From Swiss-Prot:
Its EC number is 3.5.4.16. It catalyses: GTP + H2O = 7,8-dihydroneopterin 3'-triphosphate + formate + H(+). It comes from Cupriavidus metallidurans (strain ATCC 43123 / DSM 2839 / NBRC 102507 / CH34). This is GTP cyclohydrolase FolE2 2. Belongs to the GTP cyclohydrolase IV family. PANTHER family: GTP CYCLOHYDROLASE MPTA (PTHR36445:SF1). It comes from the Bacteria. GO terms for biological process: tetrahydrofolate biosynthetic process. The lineage of its organism: Bacteria, Pseudomonadati, Pseudomonadota, Betaproteobacteria, Burkholderiales. Converts GTP to 7,8-dihydroneopterin triphosphate. Pathway: Cofactor biosynthesis; 7,8-dihydroneopterin triphosphate biosynthesis; 7,8-dihydroneopterin triphosphate from GTP: step 1/1.
């Protein structure tokens, strides 16, 4: 094993001057999987996050300090909420000596759901992404949730003597936040406006309820995005959003799709 002479100073190549004089808007690490503890209404919950972390690199600096991104995660293992996430990106800018940066973390989020008739409980998973962007002295916060629901076609119901085609749909909401909003509140906005929500475990009486609930509440993909948009528009914690609905049509080999984008600052 080679011993390092304590008098030897290892060169810091990353901090050397770059003569090409080209700014790099975003440089960092991508796809870092790390244990993650979330602060939720039910308490601390463990999951696994996939992190993308980057900073702006000045034109005269050769490289960023890649190891500091992972060190930041290792040294910040406390339960995460929006305030802690905002502080994390601020800490990253200090450590990387940067004036702009971005952290994105995606993770599965599980909610305990109670079946509508039998009362049996089960977990249902949702795909969630948090983003904190720091630039020009301001930090913007974003939350994305993909919510699976059931949709039932109003046209199919209207023209058929019995039954109607229905399918699973994905509602994806990417919201820019002006205040604290927990994941479960965002999920509820989508589930409550769908033909019916989903559960991980259902008994026969529950299946009857779900079937009839969807039949009594038919919605086109256009209805889904418009009804959810009404909820997002009325929530002062949300300043802007992109809302997508995709119905995986049971009678076609393609999806029905709709998008609404809205920024309340530019009404």
């Amino acid at each position: 094993m080679n011993d390092i002479n304590p008098a030897f100073v290892m060169p810091d190549v990353q901090s050397s001057v770059d003569t090409r004089q080209i700014v790099i808007q975003r440089v960092g690490v991508k796809g870092v999987r790390y244990p993650l503890t979330l602060k939720t209404p039910a308490g601390a919950v463990g999951t696994v996050g996939t992190f993308n972390m980057d900073v702006r690199l000045p034109a005269d600096q050769k490289g960023t300090h890649m190891s500091r991104f992972v060190a930041l995660l290792e040294e910040n293992r406390a339960p995460l909420d929006l305030a802690a996430f905002r502080a994390l990106v601020d800490d990253m800018l200090v450590r990387l000596e940067a004036d702009a940066g971005r952290i994105e973390v995606s993770f599965p989020y599980f909610i305990t759901k109670t079946a509508p008739v039998s009362g049996v409980q089960s977990l249902l998973d949702y795909e969630v992404t948090l983003v904190a962007e720091a630039r020009d002295g301001q930090t913007r916060m974003f939350m994305t949730a993909l919510v699976p629901v059931t949709s039932l076609c109003p046209c199919s119901k209207k023209i058929s003597q019995y039954g109607a085609h229905n399918q699973r749909s994905h509602i994806t909401m990417r919201v820019e936040l002006a205040g604290d909003l927990d994941v479960e509140a965002l999920v509820r906005m989508a589930e409550e406006e769908a033909s019916c929500e989903l559960w991980g475990l259902l008994k026969r009486p529950d299946e009857k309820f779900v079937t009839e609930r969807a039949y009594e509440n038919p919605k086109f993909v256009e209805d889904l995005v418009r009804d959810i948009a009404m909820r997002l528009n009325a929530d002062d914690r949300i300043v802007a959003y992109t809302l997508e609905a995709e119905n995986f049509e049971s009678i076609h080999n393609h999806s029905a799709y709709a998008v609404i984008e809205h920024d309340k600052r530019h009404q």
